[in-house]
Regions:
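Soluble "head" domains of membrane/secretory-pathway proteins
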Residues: 1-13, 17, 28, 32-38, ...
């Protein structure tokens, strides 16, 4: 104990210990709580722009289910999954909006996304003020249990579930909740 006290009085040792503790805390925060990401493409314009830096809450979906409209950061290849959409590297992440929930049918008609209870029955049009035109018709596409249908807000410029199908919940990294850079765009959503 005496040796520890003497070492702590040394400013160099104190600095090293402080940096080590700070590094360990930052590592744990990124691993379990909040992780920063950079928006890789224009598929979420005008909500998120290319190069925006965002924070995603990693812990949130351990306590609650993803909700329609959430902006989610996820692995497009579902690291470890056998059904991998697209030909993406394991380190690649996508940022998209959750549109379709498990056991729903998703389609677009006349430029508007619709959620249906059956293949073409019980359909309702989503109110999507964030979506940029053009929106081509597609579907209906079934969202299996434990899966989510993801789309970019910039519908004419987005590689999303229309191209590679729904994602598994296990592919989710976290829900994006804040733009922290550039400073002029700091905002919560």
């Amino acid at each position: 104990m005496e040796l520890f006290r003497r070492l702590r009085k040394n400013p160099v040792v104190d600095l090293i210990l402080t940096l080590a503790v700070a590094g360990a805390i930052a590592y744990v925060v990124q691993l379990w709580i909040v992780k920063p990401f950079q928006v890789p493409s224009g598929s979420m314009e005008n909500t998120l722009l290319v190069g925006d830096r965002i924070l995603a809450a990693r812990f949130l979906y351990h306590f609650t289910d993803p909700a329609r409209g959430d902006i989610i950061v996820f692995h497009p290849n579902g690291t470890g999954d056998t059904a991998a959409p697209g030909n993406h590297e394991a380190s690649v992440v996508f940022v998209k909006r959750l549109i379709g929930l498990p056991n729903e049918w998703v389609r677009a008609r006349n430029g508007h996304v619709q959620i249906c209870k059956g293949r073409n029955t019980g359909c309702r049009t989503l109110n999507e003020p964030y979506a940029l035109p053009p929106q081509e018709d597609f579907g209906p596409t079934y969202v299996p249990p434990g899966h989510y249908f993801m789309m970019g807000d910039n519908r004419g410029n987005s590689d999303d579930s229309r191209d590679w199908g729904s994602i598994r919940r296990s592919q989710s990294i976290g829900r994006a909740f804040m733009i922290y850079w550039p400073i002029t765009r700091i905002s919560f959503f």
